[in-house]
């Protein structure tokens, strides 16, 4: 069995044209996301970005921005979209992966995503302090919402994503991003 990797070692690892995460010290390497994944992610990012900018409430981070969620062994996850409230923003001079979870994480499923892996990822986010997680399934045209209090919701294409107490006042019909 290979030795466990640290977040610092992950930061120094370059695997061209691949997506990487660190899960309890084990390197996870995946293929780049496909077109539909990127399209749905960007559609939501544009809407979230307009809201966050108009409200001045924090900052969005782009896909593949890593966050250190736990140490010894290290876990570094990267959401497709993340939002951090203004009062929790890391120092811009910070290098490496911030040791925190965003307040909102968005995962857009790809055809090769496994349900158990997705649930484990959501669990890691919530355990590390995320307050809201949206898992969007473009193929099934639905979204599952996970909250820090343990409640869940299932949204159909005709329903709207709601920022709840993380992004109060934000609402986006799911169908408009699919």
Language-model regions: role of each:
Residues 1-178:
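Gly/Pro/Ser/Thr-rich low-complexity, intrinsically disordered segments predominantly at protein N-termini
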């Amino acid at each position: 069995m290979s030795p466990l990797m640290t977040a610092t070692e992950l930061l120094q690892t370059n695997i061209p044209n691949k997506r990487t995460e660190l899960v309890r010290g084990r390197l996870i390497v995946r293929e780049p996301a496909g077109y539909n994944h990127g399209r749905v992610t960007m559609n939501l990012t544009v809407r979230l970005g307009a809201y966050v900018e108009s409200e001045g409430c924090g900052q969005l981070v782009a896909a593949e921005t890593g966050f250190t969620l736990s140490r010894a062994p290290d876990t570094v996850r990267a959401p497709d979209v993340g939002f951090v409230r203004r009062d929790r923003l890391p120092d811009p001079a910070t290098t490496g992966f911030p040791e925190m979870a965003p307040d909102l994480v968005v995962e857009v499923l790809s055809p090769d995503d496994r349900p158990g892996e997705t649930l484990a990822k959501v669990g890691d986010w919530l355990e590390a302090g995320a307050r809201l997680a949206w898992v969007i399934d473009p193929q099934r045209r639905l979204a599952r919402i996970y909250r820090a209090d343990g409640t869940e919701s299932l949204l159909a294409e005709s329903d709207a994503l709601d920022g709840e107490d993380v992004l109060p006042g934000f609402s986006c019909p799911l169908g408009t991003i699919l």
